[in-house]
Amino acid sequence: MYAVFQSGGKQHRVSEGQTVRLEKLDIATGETVEFAEVLMIANGEEVKIGVPFVDGGVIKAEVVAHGRGEKVKIVKFRRRKHYRKQHGHRQWFTDVKITGISA
């Protein structure tokens, strides 16, 4: 059984027991969260596709950890003009473990 849900402007394909890295959620570590924006649920040959969301579809997950991703360097450069700027960015993320999928 697997499902596709939407969180943080992105779509994720998950199954029970899987750990997924999402955009930062303001929920403490160890707490549970429910995702109601379920786009599709598949159980063997039975597939439910939402328009846009599956009615009654809920994905339950437990927050495992929060953190920051790898650093991305941004460089602004003009040749022959002695001009260079560097900037870095580290995106916040939340790791969640999927505990249940229901339709």
From Swiss-Prot:
GO cellular component, one term: ribosome
SUPFAM superfamilies, per the entry: L21p-like
Highest taxon of the lineage: Bacteria
GO BP annotations, alphabetical order: translation
GO molecular function term, any single one: structural constituent of ribosome
Keywords: Ribonucleoprotein, Ribosomal protein, RNA-binding, rRNA-binding
Reported function: This protein binds to 23S rRNA in the presence of protein L20.
HAMAP family listed in its UniProt record: Ribosomal_bL21 (MF_01363)
The family this protein is said to belong to: Belongs to the bacterial ribosomal protein bL21 family.
PANTHER family: 50S RIBOSOMAL PROTEIN L21, LARGE RIBOSOMAL SUBUNIT PROTEIN BL21M
Record note on quaternary structure: Part of the 50S ribosomal subunit. Contacts protein L20.
Name of this protein: Large ribosomal subunit protein bL21
Gene: rplU
